[in-house]
Every structure is written in C-alpha cells, then in structure tokens.
C-alpha cells in the first residue's frame, strides 16, 4: 500500500504530556505521506494545538471521572455509549490503517472500537507508571510501547486486567531540535554556572517561592546565572521575589525556544513530567527533579527515579526541600560533576523515539 493512501487515527488528549508526543509522531508520518486525523475533546489541549498544526479533528464527548463527584460517575455509562458511537462512526468513515493511542481518557473509546473493528492498534505509555486508559488498552493492542523501561511490570505499577503485556521500550517522542550540547562543552565553560528553572507552562508555585530564597542564602560569588520560567500567572510575583531576595535573575513567563534554553544552561531545577525527563536526557542536562506531589499515581517520582538512579539527576521530594537544603546542594555543584551527570543523561536518551514509533505504525499498515 502506498504511503499516500495510508491513514493514521491518533488518540491523545487532555495534557501536553499526551498531546505533544503524539503530535510529533503525527507530523513525522505526515512527512512520509500519511493522512492523519485526531480523536479528541473540545476541552483538552488538543483542541487548540492540533488544528493549529493542520490536522483534522474528530470530536468525542468524553471526560475523566477520577476525583469527580458522584453525579459525574453515575453518568459515566451514558457518556461512554456516546463516545463509543462517535469513535465507531469516525473509524467507519475514515477507515484508518493504524490507530495510535497515547493516553488520556479520550483514547479509551477509540481504542476499544479500533479493536472491535480489527484495526491495528498501537499504545504508547509516556510515564513510568501506566495510566488507566493505557493499562486497559494494552490488553487489546497489537504493539505496546513505553517511554521508560519495565512499565507494566514494576511491582509498584498498577495491575492490568489481562496476562502480562509484552512492551517495548522506545522512549518518549520529543522535538527534533532538542539535542545534547557537544561533548565537553559544559565542562569547558567558565564563569558562573547557568541555572534553568522550569515549572511547566503554568509554572510551579513551590519552585517559584523556594529558588529565590535559596539563592539569597549563597554568597554572591557562588550564585548561578538564572533563567526562570514562571508561568504567565506568576511572572510579576516572581520578579518581586527575586528583587526582595536581592538576586539577579531573568524571569520569563514562557520559554518559546526550549532547545536553546537547554543548550545554554549547565543544570536545571524542574518538575518530573514525562516530556521534561525525556527532553533533559536528549539535551544532556543534569537536573534537580522535584516531582509534583499530587501527580496521578505519583508517576513523577518514578519518572525522576529513572534519571536519578543512573546518576543523571538529583531527586528530592517537595516536602523534603527547603531553601537551606537547596542552597547547600547548589553550593556543592562543580562543572566536572555536571559533565559526568550530563554524560549519564545522554546514555539514557532515546532521541530516535519519534521515528521508532512512526516506523512501528508503518510496519503494522503493511
């Protein structure tokens, strides 16, 4: 079958951790001549970024119920019936050659209907702990791919309602412009260390509050040069916080060119979302990882442990991190140590993840 006649249905929704890796694969397959359409909701991030990328959307009426009230849970059967019908209609109309599910509750009805109609189904799990949708769909999938090793087999992982799944560790698709700095470049730098602080697109209040106070405890000669992404809601407050601490810092509400930000920094302080961890590894950036304490199934701790256990990062839980402890850690950092950590990060990276997932989709279409 010619690539120009192949069609991919993507199912990923809700957050950037699901949407952006799926978008990377979708764009790669479009470059190879595939037609792509996307199953999503109007409430998720996909409603904004997927049409902007020129990909057709098929809307489904699906919402999560975890942490919701009783009424929402009682309405789940009716909501699923509607979403199943919408997904079934999309598959019958568009007749995709391969269906790619990359998490989020939106993927569940589409994945179930793809299996019912005997469409090749690929499931990719971005986190170190399998999400509910992917745990269910993994039992039906033709190929199960993971961003971290041993997902669905960890003792701490959630059970799956079938025999043990055979999963393949392919890594997390990241943007192609995120690559490691040339070997030895960071160790050869002189002057103050360069610190990048990132709390995600919305910022991280705990990091915004803690980092300025920690840097204020250091002698001025030991302070790194700081670029701090605050999140749009926190930019003014964070600038005031650095000013009150008498610490010079470049505060940005959002960093458009993360590839350049990674290349320019010596180390980072950030959360441990799946995309962040994958990007740090590909960019070879040592990091202090502070997992978001309220992440579903505490998956950010597992994500962070992947780098920390290999000596590529420090892992500190938010409840254990104080300004004093952070200042002590920063004071003990030197370029040789950072260079060694950077090498470890690069060894763990899977920079070809996007192409690998695309290759697997193509193989199933033959």
Curated annotation (Swiss-Prot):
| A GO term from the CC aspect | plasma membrane
Enzyme Commission (EC) number: 2.4.1.227
Q: Which InterPro entries match?
A: GlcNAc_MurG, Glyco_trans_28_C, GlycoTrans_28_N
| Record's keyword annotation contains Glycosyltransferase | yes
Write down the CDD domains for this protein, in alphabetical order: GT28_MurG
Identify the residues that bind UDP-N-acetyl-alpha-D-glucosamine: 15-17, 127, 175, 201, 255, 300
One BP term from GO: cell division
Q: How does it sit in the membrane?
A: Peripheral membrane protein
Which regions span the lipid bilayer? none
Any idea where this protein resides?
Cell inner membrane
Query: Which keywords, in A-to-Z order, does the entry hold?
Result: Cell cycle, Cell division, Cell inner membrane, Cell membrane, Cell shape, Cell wall biogenesis/degradation, Glycosyltransferase, Membrane, Peptidoglycan synthesis, Transferase
**To which pathway does this protein belong?**
Cell wall biogenesis; peptidoglycan biosynthesis
The protein's GO terms of the molecular function aspect are: UDP-N-acetyl-D-glucosamine:N-acetylmuramoyl-L-alanyl-D-glutamyl-meso-2,6-diaminopimelyl-D-alanyl-D-alanine-diphosphoundecaprenol 4-beta-N-acetylglucosaminlytransferase activity; undecaprenyldiphospho-muramoylpentapeptide beta-N-acetylglucosaminyltransferase activity
Q: Which domain of life is it from?
A: Bacteria
Q: Which reaction does it catalyse?
A: di-trans,octa-cis-undecaprenyl diphospho-N-acetyl-alpha-D-muramoyl-L-alanyl-D-glutamyl-meso-2,6-diaminopimeloyl-D-alanyl-D-alanine + UDP-N-acetyl-alpha-D-glucosamine = di-trans,octa-cis-undecaprenyl diphospho-[N-acetyl-alpha-D-glucosaminyl-(1->4)]-N-acetyl-alpha-D-muramoyl-L-alanyl-D-glutamyl-meso-2,6-diaminopimeloyl-D-alanyl-D-alanine + UDP + H(+)
Q: Which family does it belong to?
A: Belongs to the glycosyltransferase 28 family. MurG subfamily.
Describe the function of this protein: Cell wall formation. Catalyzes the transfer of a GlcNAc subunit on undecaprenyl-pyrophosphoryl-MurNAc-pentapeptide (lipid intermediate I) to form undecaprenyl-pyrophosphoryl-MurNAc-(pentapeptide)GlcNAc (lipid intermediate II).
Query: Which protein is depicted?
Result: UDP-N-acetylglucosamine--N-acetylmuramyl-(pentapeptide) pyrophosphoryl-undecaprenol N-acetylglucosamine transferase
Gene behind this protein: murG
